[in-house]
Amino acid sequence: GGLACALLFAALQLIRLGLISFGEGPRPADRWPSPVSLEGQERWMMILQDGQRIGTSHTRLEPLAAGYRLKETVRMRLNTMGLVQDLVLASSGWLNPDLTLDRFTFTLQSGRFAFGVRGRVESGHLVCEVRTGDEERPLRLALDGPLYLTAGILPALIRADPVPGEQQVFAVFDPATLA
């Protein structure tokens, strides 16, 4: 229990500090098609640490009758103090036609440790159920405006089609940190 939580915290910190990178690839505009055709797009990325591949990220944007479904799976094999742990993060987001968040599910699995959260945008709040092990608890967060999932920022930016020098502001929700 405690070791898995510590490994999760360490993995997320490594990503946030930039010690684990997603590698260099084509410019964002080359990864996704023009704003008129975001449907059915897929992106694979390697996750590198000190130049060594430690995992992959797979993101898929699928069209739905009333918006999109954004699926992302991240798999990493981390070696922490000589102990190798597999870490799998899986998220699905159901997005509105403007790519803002409507509802989502998220799971994190590492060994026997499991964490999950599902939620929906409802009346200016993000209403969630958080599950750790066999325990589930509710969480209600007030919203200042529409939310975007991290993996949905690139398609939303392309959809916005900004001109050079124009700023775009996106309120991002990360289910892994509930922030």
Language-model features: where?
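Solvent-exposed helix/loop surface patches that form functional interfaces
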Residues: 8-44, 109-179
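N-terminal Sec-pathway targeting helices
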Residues: 1-8
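N-terminal mature ectodomain segment of secretory-pathway/periplasmic proteins
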Residues: 49-132
